């Protein structure tokens, strides 16, 4: 670890303006991004007394080996830049809200002739009416299934709707009464729109008149001895009431707000959100996040807003109002930023009394319960992972615990569709963004395939190091190197980090441990591949199935870890994950090969032109026998494409396809 004083910038070089700062490790990788109203004051706080910082902050400061920053004109700009860089760099020490999907909504495509009801995510579109958000897509589908009894509107895609009209037969929902079947003319466009309007009125909260109407019709049907119709109306009424139970009215004024509360301890914080739309609770979400520094409730509100409401789909779910336990210090800048994302004014406030205060307290109780459950579940997790890594290090004779483990596996059937997988575990947890898949073309057995994939993986790593040179790597944390605005635009190890995205390049970071799926033969093949490349600073082992033996290079006998060993359990998880990733890729390629033609492998040749070729020549056999000039007679086919088509047909297996 670096001494923070070795890279501390001179106070006079740091501006006092708003801005964003980045801490980097020895390889140039961004490990923390922060925003400051006053950059000089904020950065000095990290170096004044680093030993007494918050545990995670102290770890970050001692892990980093350089710091740089950019200054901006306003706090709103700093807020936007901070959010952009957190998304771009994915720093390991920033607070992370892992659930990054956009919210699901129940959408009605009112701009279509026959409006459709469907579940939608992402940015809002013109001509679509939205209800939500909901916490889970299944919650929407459950509500929709109940309401289709009463409002049998169209839910199918345009393709299904068109095909049903062509054959004159509705889909299953049309037969069971959950669709009015406008596709076959069972109802007119006006009648179908009336059904959709009734659905929208119900979702908007105008339910009383509808319930009274159904009750009246049910009584009339019963009085006229139409018992089947009365029973159907009774069931419709029950479905409406069940749907209404899922949307309890909490505010009578049509409030559109998110109610946010936190419960925290020195290391973690639980976040709970209730989504209130049109005065009703439409959904709930929750996270538990690590705290990287001492954070007040206002700081947590700031982090929550920038990470949850920002980004590509942020405008789809920013509410008019946020009810929070404490306002952040930059509340005006934060409100302006949120308003910019929403497209209209957003307010943040702390409710003091009444129904809104009561709901905030309910959300806070949920957060407290969630944190307690999380701590109970994860009480031994960090200790367990540390113990597992230490056991692996002891077994393999490593000086330090392997914080980055890479595992490789091969999947094939009798030498066909040979593929390999590489999975990555950091700190004992999977790092799925670093997983990689390989198509093996020069080998047909597991040993040669394992040798090939390791050569390809580590050749890429060595190429990255060669571009900078060993000197650049060693001087990454040079205490005499300039910092701040005088620092170079990129670290001298910039080849490890893509300058355009700020993310690590593929294969740029070496593992401390390589695990292969197999026993002594696989380990020997892997060791030979690493030796040929001159890689001698990476530990290697193999985990054999059935007996779960750990094989080391040049050892005649395996190491046996106890069946209850946490180290063995972690190795098994890594091995099983590599196997799952490899076999999934193998099945995809095998399925694609069994259903595709040689034309599918021609780059840039789409479905329309493939059909045109087959219509023109009648079969692949005739197409393969044609000349380039004859193929170019087909509209849209040029000479280069014709040559690619003939090359693909001459090699139907695709084995000569260039490596990607």
UniProtKB/Swiss-Prot annotation:
GO cellular component: cytoplasm; excinuclease repair complex
A Pfam family assignment: UVR
PROSITE patterns from the UniProt entry: GIY_YIG (PS50164), UVR (PS50151), UVRC (PS50165)
GO molecular function: DNA binding; excinuclease ABC activity
BP-aspect Gene Ontology terms: nucleotide-excision repair; SOS response
Quaternary structure note: Interacts with UvrB in an incision complex.
HAMAP family cross-referenced by the UniProt entry: UvrC
Full protein name: UvrABC system protein C
Gene name for this UniProt entry: uvrC
């Amino acid at each position: 670890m670096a001494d923070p004083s070795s890279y501390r910038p001179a106070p006079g070089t740091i501006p006092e303006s708003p801005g964003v700062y980045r801490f980097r490790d020895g390889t140039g990788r961004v490990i923390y991004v922060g925003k400051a109203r006053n950059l000089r004051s904020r950065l000095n706080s990290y170096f004044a007394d680093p030993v007494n910082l918050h545990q995670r902050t102290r770890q970050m400061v001692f892990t980093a080996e350089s710091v740089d920053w950019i200054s901006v004109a306003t706090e709103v700009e700093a807020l936007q830049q901070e959010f952009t860089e957190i998304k771009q760099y994915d720093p390991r020490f920033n607070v992370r809200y892992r659930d990054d999907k956009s919210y699901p909504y129940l959408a009605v495509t009112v701009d279509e002739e026959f409006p459709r009801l469907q579940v939608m995510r992402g940015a809002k579109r013109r001509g679509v009416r939205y209800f939500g958000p909901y916490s889970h897509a299944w919650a929407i589908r459950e509500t929709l299934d109940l309401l289709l009894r009463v409002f049998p509107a169209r839910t199918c895609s345009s393709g299904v709707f068109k095909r049903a009209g062509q054959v004159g037969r509705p889909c299953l929902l049309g037969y069971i009464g959950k669709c009015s079947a406008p596709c076959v003319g069972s109802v007119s466009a006006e009648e179908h729109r009336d059904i959709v309007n009734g659905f929208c009125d119900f979702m908007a909260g105008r339910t009383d008149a509808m319930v009274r109407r159904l009750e009246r019709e049910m009584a009339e049907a019963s009085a006229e001895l139409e018992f089947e119709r009365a029973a159907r109306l009774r069931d419709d009424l029950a479905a409406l009431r069940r749907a209404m139970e899922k949307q309890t009215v909490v505010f009578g004024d049509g409030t559109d707000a998110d109610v946010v509360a936190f419960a925290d301890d020195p290391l973690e914080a639980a976040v709970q959100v209730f989504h209130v739309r049109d005065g009703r609770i439409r959904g709930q979400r929750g996270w538990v996040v690590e705290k990287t520094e001492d954070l007040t409730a206002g700081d947590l509100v700031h982090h929550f807003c920038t990470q949850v409401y920002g980004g590509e789909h942020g405008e789809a779910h920013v509410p008019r109002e946020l009810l929070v336990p404490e306002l952040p210090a930059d509340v005006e800048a934060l409100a302006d930023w949120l308003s910019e994302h929403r497209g209209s004014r957003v307010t943040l406030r702390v409710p003091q009394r009444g129904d809104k205060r009561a709901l905030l307290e309910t959300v806070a109780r949920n957060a407290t319960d969630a944190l307690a459950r999380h701590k109970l579940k994860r009480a031994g997790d960090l200790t367990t992972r540390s113990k597992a890594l230490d056991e692996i290090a002891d077994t393999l004779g490593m000086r330090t615990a392997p914080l980055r483990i890479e595992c490789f596996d091969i999947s094939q059937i009798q030498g066909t569709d040979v593929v390999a997988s590489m999975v990555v575990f950091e700190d004992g947890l999977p790092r799925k963004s670093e997983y990689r898949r390989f198509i093996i073309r020069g080998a047909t057995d597991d040993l040669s395939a394992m040798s090939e994939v390791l050569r390809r993986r580590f050749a890429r790593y060595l190429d990255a190091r060669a571009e900078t040179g060993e000197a650049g790597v060693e001087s990454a944390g040079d205490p005499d190197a300039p910092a701040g605005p005088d620092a170079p635009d990129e670290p001298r190890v910039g080849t490890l980090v893509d300058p355009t995205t700020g993310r690590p390049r593929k294969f740029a970071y070496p593992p401390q441990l390589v695990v292969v799926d197999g026993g002594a033969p696989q380990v020997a093949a892997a060791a030979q591949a690493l030796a040929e490349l001159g890689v001698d600073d990476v530990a290697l082992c193999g985990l054999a199935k059935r007996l779960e033996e750990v094989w080391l290079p040049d050892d005649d006998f395996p190491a046996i870890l106890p069946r209850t060993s946490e180290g063995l359990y972690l190795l098994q998880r890594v091995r099983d994950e590599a196997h799952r990733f490899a076999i999934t890729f193998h099945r995809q390629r095998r399925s694609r090969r069994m259903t595709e033609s040689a034309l599918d492998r021609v780059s840039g040749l789409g479905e329309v032109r493939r059909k045109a070729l087959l219509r023109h020549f009648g079969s692949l056999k005739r197409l393969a026998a044609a000349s380039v000039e004859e193929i170019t007679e087909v509209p849209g086919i040029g000479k280069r494409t014709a040559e690619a088509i003939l090359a693909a047909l001459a090699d139907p297996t695709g084995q000569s396809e260039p490596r990607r």
